[in-house]
Structures are given as C-alpha cells and as structure tokens.
Amino acid sequence: NKGDVVLHQVTFLEGWTFKQVMDAIKTEPEIKHLLADKSDAKRLEILNLPISHPEGWFFPDTYRFSRGTSDVEILTQAYNAMRKNLDELWANKSANLPYRNDYEALIMASIIEKETGHEGERDKIAGVFVRRLQIGMPLQTDPTVIYGMGDAYRGKISRDDLKRPTSYNTYTIQGLPPTPIAIPGKASLYAVLH
C-alpha cells in the first residue's frame, strides 16, 4: 500500500567485535552513514554515550529500521538494549562475584562469548574464570590473546604470542583485560552473573 513504511534490517551477532558491527552497518545502503569513515574516538564523540570504549556495548540482535535511519540511531538502540540487559542481570546477580562493577561483568561475558558457542559450556567456563579471578590466578584464555594481537593474528597462536605482553594477554596479566573483546549475548551475561 502507498504510505506503508518499508522496514530494512541489520543483524549484529554474538561474539562480533565493534569493527564487525560497523562493517555490517556500512553494507546497508538504506542507513544514513554518519560514522562510517570516522575513528572510534570520533564515533564515540558523535554517539554521545556514557562509554569510553565501543567494544562490547552493542547488544547482538536484529534491528529493523526505515530508510534514512542513521547508524547513530541504530547503535544507540543497540547500546540501550545492552544497558537494559546488563542492568537487569546485574540487579539479580549471585552473591560473592569478583566484579567491582557491571563493566567488569561485561568484559567477562565477552570472554565467555568468544571462548565457547555451546550453551551447556558457558556456566562451566564462567565458573572456572570466576574462581581464577577470586584466587588471583591469570585467566589464561586464548580469545583475549587473539584480540590483543589485532591484525597480526593470522589464524594461529604461537608460544611467543602467549608470552608477549599486551594489556589483553590473560596469560601475562592478572585479572581482566581493560575492555570487552566482543559483544556478548544474554546467555553469556547470565552465565557470568550467576
């Protein structure tokens, strides 16, 4: 019918990095692109969200939009969805977890998301990592090493890579890396908070 609004959609998947989210947005011709050729710092400035790093903050889901909707509007919607899910789960978290704040839980959830895609393993892996944090043991998880390698990662991790200190190498650092390494889904958020 005339007057019906045609809806388009863009999907962000669990485990994606912010770069992958932006790549998905860039491929949608019906989106008004305000962020495409900007640095992450400039994108954050334009988004005007209360975050200092974009990684992990945009909830994985399918977002429907009409032609001319901006990438800023879609990312704001995805941020609000992550914030809502994180707030709800944080408010009902288990006692005695080693996180100082919900951002640390988001970081841990991103690690769980990259560590396994199997539903039944999330709780077990989260339990192992929580115990390691509680006793001050390094997390020792390959996905953080891979993230820290950036474009240098070519499909394999060497022993040297595991020893090379980066702020994301959980073989060489104590505790959590400084930011999430991907966008976690609700199941990973739940696993690290229960």
Question: Where in this protein do the model-derived segments appear?
Answer:
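Short, flexible domain-boundary/linker segments around small modular repeats
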Residues: 1-4, 42-45
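Glycine-rich loop/hinge motif
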Residues: 2-30, 95-102
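Bacterial extracytoplasmic/cell-wall-associated proteins, especially those involved in peptidoglycan
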Residues: 29-31, 44-194
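Short, well-structured active-site flanking segments
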Residues: 32-40
